[in-house]
Amino acid sequence: MKSTSINISRFFIKTYALIQIVFALILTFGGAYLLYLGGSIYYLFTGILLLISGIYIFRIKLSGTKIFAVIFVYTLIWTMWEAGTRFWGWIPRLATIAIFAFFLTLLLPYFEHGIRKKIAYSFTGLIVICFFTAGALAWYPYFTTLDNSQIPQNTTNTYHSVSAQPDDDWRYYGRDTQGTRFSPSNQITPENINQLKQVWVTRTGDMPPIDKKNKWAAQTTPIKVNDALYLCTATNNMLKLDARTGKKIWEYKHNLAYEKLPSTAVCRGVTFYTSKVIPENEICHEKVIEGTLDMQLIAVDAKTGKACPQFGTKGHVNLLEGIGHTVPGFMAVTSPPPVVNGVIVVNHKVQDNQRRTAPSGVIRAYDVDTGSLKWAWDVRQPNRHGLPPKGETYSRGTPNSWTVMTVDEKLNTVYVPTGSSAPDYYSALRTEEENQISTAVVALDALTGVKKWSFQTVHKDAWDYDLGSQATLLDYKDQSGNVVPALIMPTKRGQTFVLNRITGKPISNVVERQAPKSIIPDDVRSPTQPWSVDIPRLGFSDLTESKMWGISPIDQMLCRIK
C-alpha cells in the first residue's frame, strides 16, 4: 500500500516536472531571441534555471525545489522593481510562477529527503497569501501621476473679453466664453467637501420607450443664471429650475419624434443670451437657445419658456435648409451653440463612418434675435457664404464639428474643433481642402465666416480622432514679457497643443515625428504626425519593454519581442 502511494506521488512529481520543463524550454528559446534584440535577460536566465530545476525535480531530487525557490524569490523582487504596485504588471510576471510554486509545495513531502507536511504546507499558505495580496492590489490606483508644479502667475486678461457674471453663476457650458471651466466661488473646499449633503433632486421624466433600443444619454451641463438653472433633456425638452429648491419653473417640450433620433439621444446644454436689440420689457429680451437632434434651432423666452415669435418661424429655424438629401438621425446638433457679436454659430454631428456622400459638415451663423442666416462656411466652397444656389447643396462628406465651440468677442473669432471627412476610416477619396482642415482647430471670422487660420492636430486622420473637447482661451506673458493670446486644445491622442489664437502658430514646441505607413492600396497616410513635445502627454507615457501586456510570462515575452 505504501509502495502504491509512493508510485502515485512520483507520478504527480514527474508530471509536474515535465510541464515545468516544457515551460522552461519556451522561456529559454524566446528569452534568447529577446536578449538578442536587446531586451531583458530575465526570460533566458529564468528559462535555464527552470530547466535545470525541472530535471532535478523529475529525478525526485529536493535540490530542484531549492533552485525553484531561488527563482521565485528573485522573480518576486524583479516584479516589484519593474511593476511596482500595478496589479496587471504582477499578473504576467508572477502569477504563473506562483501557480507552479503552489503545486510544488504540495509535493514537497514526497521528494527524496522531503520535508515534513506541516512545513511544506506552511509554504503553500504563503503562496495563497501572495495570491490574496495580488488580488488586493487590483483595487489600488495605478498609472497615475501628480503634477506638483506651481500654477503660472503671469496670466493676464489683455485680450480676454471677460464674461461679466456673479461669482456663483455658471452662464456658459465652460463657465465663461473662454471655456475656462473655473468658478471663483469658494464655499466648497477640499476640507468640507465630505460634508456635502443632497438638498434636492429633480427628474426630467425624459426616458426611452421600454420597447426601443436607442440609448438615452444624460450629458447636459446646466447653466446657472442668477437664481435659475437652465438645461435640456436627452430629447431636447428645455427646463428652468429654481436653483435653491430644484422646483420646475417652466418646461418647453420639443416633442421630438422617435424616428428622428440618432443612435444616442443626447443634448449637452443650452445657450443663454440677453438681447442688445429687443427692449427689456419685451418677450425674449432674455432667451434660451438650443440646437436639436432633428436639426432645428429653437429660441424661447427665459422668463416664460414660450417660443420667441421674432426668431425664425415661431421660434424655430430649419437647419436642414441647403443640406440636401439625408435621413432622420443622420445629422444632429448635440452641443450648445455660442453667441458672438450678435450671431449664434451652429455646428452639428454627422454619421460620418458610413458613406462618402454623408451630409455636409458646414458651419453656419444666424442672427441671434431674428434667426436669419448671416453666413455659412463650406470647406469646398470657401467663397460662398450664403445658401447654395437652387438645385445645389452644401458640400457633402466634409469634416463636421460636433463638440462645443469657443468664441473671442474682442478678436471677433469663433474657434471650431473639427473631425474628419466621411468616411472616418478611409481617406483616399478626400479633397485637398478637406485634408487641410480635418481634425483641426479652425478660426473663423464671426461676422463673415471667412477662415482666418487652421491648425491640424492629426494629418489625414483615418482613426476617428475628432477633436472632442472645447478649446480654452488663456493669455500669458512669454519669455520676452509680451502678452500672448493663447488657445489650449487637448486631443484624443493625449497631445495638448498651445497656439497663438491670433495667428494659429504653436506657442509651445511642436515637432513632426515619423508615423506608420498604410498597407491599404491607394490610401496613403501622412509620413509624419504633429507632437506637442513641451506639454506633458495625457494618458500613458511612451511604451517601453517593461510596460508590455500579458497574462503569463510567455505571452508577455512575445509582446516584448514584438
What would you call each of these model-derived segments?
Residues I193-M207, M238-K260, T274, I278, ...:
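Extracytoplasmic/lumenal domain signature
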